[in-house]
Swiss-Prot record:
Substrate binds at H124, R154, D155, R186, R192, R263, A264, D265, R266, K357. InterPro entries: Alkaline_phosphatase_core_sf, BPG-indep_PGM_N, Metalloenzyme, PGAM_B_sf, Pgm_bpd_ind. Belongs to the BPG-independent phosphoglycerate mutase family. One of its GO terms (biological process) is glycolytic process. It comes from Herpetosiphon aurantiacus (strain ATCC 23779 / DSM 785 / 114-95). This is 2,3-bisphosphoglycerate-independent phosphoglycerate mutase. GO terms for cellular component: cytosol. It comes from the Bacteria. Its cofactor is Mn(2+). Mn(2+) 1 binds at D424, H428, H484. Catalyzes the interconversion of 2-phosphoglycerate and 3-phosphoglycerate. The lineage of its organism: Bacteria, Bacillati, Chloroflexota, Chloroflexia, Herpetosiphonales. The active site is at S63 (phosphoserine intermediate). Monomer. GO terms for molecular function: manganese ion binding; phosphoglycerate mutase activity.
């Protein structure tokens, strides 16, 4: 194999693989170029969903995660999956932030409090993460462990919380550690819109023991449903009492608090309420600003009573870069993405897309880095201003292709990456004739660009980051299917025969995933993959 130049990565966003049928926008389309390359060039199918891209098992892929994995050259586990996988491996129970919290609560002889959303909504928290913490407390002999349960009803059914609470009570009974000390809906505890009076109600229950009372959390929820049939999200603060009617331990001086939500946005305010020393000043300034803008203020402005002193606070993930608290699962930084390896080798690169997918070929592909690397040029075409893209399924693909063709013909770039957004963005409309046009547009654009790459002695890798356009009919309802899919995606290598990258000379390994693309591209460029890249090249010599 000789080194091709340039190497093009063309991402056909949302172009998945599925059997032909009336709902398959890809197979319904007239795509002579892609069909020809599929029939004559090295091809394989890639996994682009679930654990293969760092998402929970069975979860559909998406463009952000897809491009992140493509550029990182490794499976980038999302926070929720990192935590879940660490429970399976046992690393969870050796987490330094958790063990430090255990040590502190033992040394002080105080109480452990676990706060967060319960249930299996999976958007902000997972029940297995709370169960893992309870198991850890049992292992470490932290018997004085209290749970402040935020109820969902938004990412779960409105009155599903009763069942989830029964499951939690069963888990507590099996593990032998933990008591639910308070129950409150996420409407209050997880406000993110500076409605401090809502957060104040959660604070009052957890810290002051103020709210409705119930002898157990099941009764608390049943009583709440009678007060407000809207369900879990709107459960007013309820304090759980012991057999003598005394509230279970509140969050008090010297206690340890672990917030087990993995998603940050809806637990920043409750974290500030518990921990920020100048909270009241901040709240007053915010409301003053609201008043200056002529906005309506609440009847009473919540102000925190005296702050609980000497709390030790642990966040499950990084909730805010300015928070000085212990983090159990800090951000995973991608230090050597594909673009950096190429830049460090002194090579030139070109990243291109239209507006809808421009962040994906820049920020996400480059490992969540905003600034371009040395020798990296970025070119964007504006997406059309239409209400929905079925009205203009061609989008701005022709402009993207024209700019890309100019870049190829300039012969100054070693590596080029382009995203054609059409199959995904039009796929989200569920309008099959428009999706067909979208796929045909991408095929036509590739038919202009790929031959130019090959003519220069180069190679093009055609892939998708996830599926979408190949499933436009919901198999359950028969109605439109507008979401991404878990289907495999294509990977086609089209190259100048002189490079030795033909179907007769090489094959593309089966069973690959998006994380294998960066090592494959570096293999084509004759560069060593970064040490952190755990993906492997798809190219196999016959």
């Amino acid at each position: 194999m000789t080194t091709p130049r340039p190497v093009l990565l063309a991402i056909m966003d949302g172009w998945g693989l599925a059997p032909a049928g009336p709902g398959n926008g890809v197979s319904l389309a007239n795509t002579p170029n892609v069909n020809h390359w599929m029939a004559t060039c090295p091809t394989t199918q890639l996994h682009a969903s679930g654990l293969d891209v760092g998402l929970p098992e069975g979860q559909i892929g998406n463009s952000e995660v897809g491009h992140l994995n493509i550029g990182a050259g490794l499976v980038v586990y999302q926070d929720s999956t990192r935590i879940s996988e660490s429970i399976k491996s046992g690393e969870f129970f050796e987490n330094p932030a958790f063990l430090e919290a255990v040590q502190i609560v033992k040394e002080r002889g105080t109480n452990m409090h676990l706060i967060g959303l319960i249930g299996r909504g999976g958007v902000h928290a997972y029940d297995i993460h709370l169960a893992g913490l309870l198991q850890l407390m049992a292992q470490q002999g932290v018997n004085h462990t209290y749970i402040h349960a935020f109820m969902d009803g938004r990412d779960t059914l409105p009155q599903s919380g009763l069942g989830y609470m029964r499951e939690l009570q069963q888990t507590i009974s099996q593990i032998g550690v933990g008591q639910v000390a308070s129950v409150i809906g996420r409407y209050y505890a997880m406000d993110r819109d500076k409605r401090w009076e809502r957060v104040g109600a959660a604070y009052a229950a957890m810290v002051e023991g103020v709210g409705h009372t119930a002898s157990d959390p099941i009764s608390a929820i049943e009583q709440a449903y009678l007060r407000d049939a809207r369900g879990d999200e709107f459960i007013e603060a309820t304090v759980i009492t012991d057999s003598a009617g005394v509230a279970l331990p509140r969050i008090s001086t010297g206690d340890v608090v672990i917030c087990f939500n993995f998603r940050a946005d809806r637990v920043r305010q409750i974290t500030r309420a518990l921990m920020q020393s100048d909270l009241n000043t901040m709240i007053q300034e915010w409301y003053a600003n609201q008043a200056e803008q002529g906005l309506q203020l609440p009847t009473t402005i919540w102000q925190r009573p005296e702050q609980v002193s000497n709390l030790h606070y642990v966040t499950m993930t990084q909730y805010d870069a300015t928070f000085p608290y212990a983090i159990a699962y800090p951000p995973h930084y991608i230090t050597e993405p594909l673009a950096k390896v190429i830049a460090d080798a002194g090579k030139r690169q070109y990243h291109s897309a239209e507006t809808e997918k421009y962040p994906h070929v820049t920020f996400f592909l480059n490992g969540r880095r905003e600034e371009p690397f040395a020798g990296e040029d970025r070119v964007m075409a504006a997406s059309p201003k239409v209400a929905t893209y079925d009205l203009q399924p061609e989008m701005s693909a022709e402009e993207v292709a024209a700019k890309l063709l100019d870049a190829v013909n300039s012969q100054i770039y070693d590596f080029l990456v382009v995203n054609f957004a059409n199959p995904d963005m039009v796929g989200h409309t569920g309008v099959i004739p428009a999706v067909v046009k979208a796929c045909e547009t991408v095929d036509r654009c590739l038919g202009q660009v790929v031959p130019a790459v090959v003519a220069q002695g180069g190679a093009a890798i055609l892939i998708a980051d996830h599926g979408n356009a190949e499933q436009m009919i919901d198999p359950q309802t028969g109605g439109p299917h507008t979401a991404h899919t878990t289907n495999l995606v294509p990977c086609i290598l089209v190259a100048d025969p002189a490079t030795g990258l033909t179907r007769e000379q090489i094959s593309l390994r089966a069973g690959g995933r998006l994380a294998d693309l960066a090592p494959t591209i570096l293999d084509l460029l004759g560069l060593q993959k970064a040490a952190a890249m755990t993906g492997t090249s798809l190219i196999e010599t016959k």
